[in-house]
Amino acid sequence: MTTRTGPEDEAWSDYASEIATNLRRLRHEASLSHEDVAYRSGLTRYTHQKYEKGHSKPGTPANPTIRSLLAMPQALGVSLMDILPAKIPDLRLRYLQAPPAAHA
């Protein structure tokens, strides 16, 4: 298994952390428990807690499914845009920095 450490991976880690912060803040504002949001989202409590921590396992940023990204804000009574940070990381950096032959 390869460990990613490029700038795009740091950007993704920061982005995942911001999503986690937003999820936690919105859950607290709605006075809901992990169990409440997990149940309403169709997730396990454990999975929901991982998303709120921003990590799927230590050192690995959370990477929620599209379904989870749509279900969690609905469970919280907010829009998807309330969860997603405004600045989207450019995940193409590795591709853009590769030599032209690597793109063929």
Regions found by a protein language model. Give the residues of each.
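Alpha-helical residues within the helix-turn-helix
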Residues: 28, 39, 74
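Short alpha-helical DNA-recognition segment
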Residues: 31-57
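Short, charged recognition helix plus adjacent turn
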Residues: 2-6, 74, 81-104
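DNA major-groove recognition helix of helix-turn-helix
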Residues: 52, 68, 76, 84-87
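Residues within the helices of the helix-turn-helix
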Residues: 24-25, 35, 70
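Short, basic-rich loop-to-helix N-cap that marks the start of a DNA-contacting helix
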Residues: 55-74
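A short, Lys/Arg-rich alpha-helix, primarily the initiator
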Residues: 2-31
